[in-house]
Curated annotation (Swiss-Prot):
Keyword Hydrolase tagged: no
Enzyme's top EC category: transferase
Coiled-coil intervals, chain numbering: none
Name of the protein this chain belongs to: Ribosomal RNA small subunit methyltransferase G
Species of the source: Finegoldia magna (strain ATCC 29328 / DSM 20472 / WAL 2508)
Binding site for S-adenosyl-L-methionine: G74, F79, A125, E126, R144
Classification lineage: Bacteria, Bacillati, Bacillota, Tissierellia, Tissierellales
Molecular function GO terms recorded: rRNA (guanine-N7-)-methyltransferase activity
Gene: rsmG
Length: 230
């Protein structure tokens, strides 16, 4: 099945130029994956579903306002940010990752695909949010990272402006209870949790609204968000 057909099955409509950009992006990921660990998914049709559908289906569930700023925390090989950027060129993206090799690869992807209003930054989230350039500067923070919701919220919510949103792409929604207290401490409130399936796998989108500023002591350093979650 072609990528276009797969996307159509999930009600994701892209033009031919956008499809071509996604396919070129996949080729870049799979080529670099031969010398660097970017993804365990190397079969193309599976890549279409697990990376492209998984990233783009968010646009069917959440309405991002036009021309807004988004930071993707722990972006890895660029998911979900780069597919969303290809689909929604109006959005302005920052891709954050703590591994320099990955960030160098993402910069190459941005150049190869001629994407604009998008940058890749090499930094740890807990360091990045200590700077005025990044703290509470974004309309949205999105993440597909595997951390538990309480840990993820401590890394992500400090980036979000009051009135903005953190969007967490998770597995089953039964873990959201774990994060509720942390989210409140960090200035957020779970607005909704949307359950859905991708390729018969349970997924959930946790939408968190930033209702007040995050206290300056967060995020904590020294690995505390993971070792000792709020």
């Amino acid at each position: 099945m072609s990528l276009k057909e797969t996307l159509n099955d999930y009600d994701i409509q892209l033009d031919d130029n956008q499809i071509d950009l996604l396919l070129k992006y996949m080729d870049l990921v799979l080529e670099k994956n031969k010398v660097m660990n970017l993804t365990a998914i190397t079969e193309e049709e599976m890549f279409h579903v697990k990376h492209f559908v998984d990233s783009l289906y968010v646009l069917n569930l959440f309405d991002f306002e036009e021309n807004k700023t988004i930071i993707d925390v722990g972006t890895g090989a660029g998911f979900p940010a780069i597919p969303i950027k290809i689909a929604r060129n109006d959005l302005k993206f920052t891709l954050l990752d703590s591994l320099r090799k990955r960030v160098d690869f993402l910069k190459d992807v941005i150049d190869e695909l001629h994407l604009t209003d998008i940058k890749a930054v090499h930094e740890r989230a807990e360091e990045c949010t200590r700077t005025a350039e990044y703290r509470e500067q974004y309309d949205y923070c999105i993440s597909r990272a595997v951390s538990k919701l309480d840990t993820l919220a401590e890394f992500c919510l400090p980036f979000v402006k009051v009135g903005g949103y953190m969007i967490a792409m998770k597995g089953k929604s039964d873990e959201t209870d774990v994060g509720e207290n942390a989210i409140k401490i960090l200035g957020g409130k779970i607005e909704q949790t949307i359950d859905y399936k991708i390729d018969d796998e349970d997924r959930s989108l946790v939408v968190i609204k930033k209702i007040k500023e995050t206290p300056k002591k967060y995020p904590r350093g020294g690995g505390k968000p993971k070792k000792n979650p709020l």
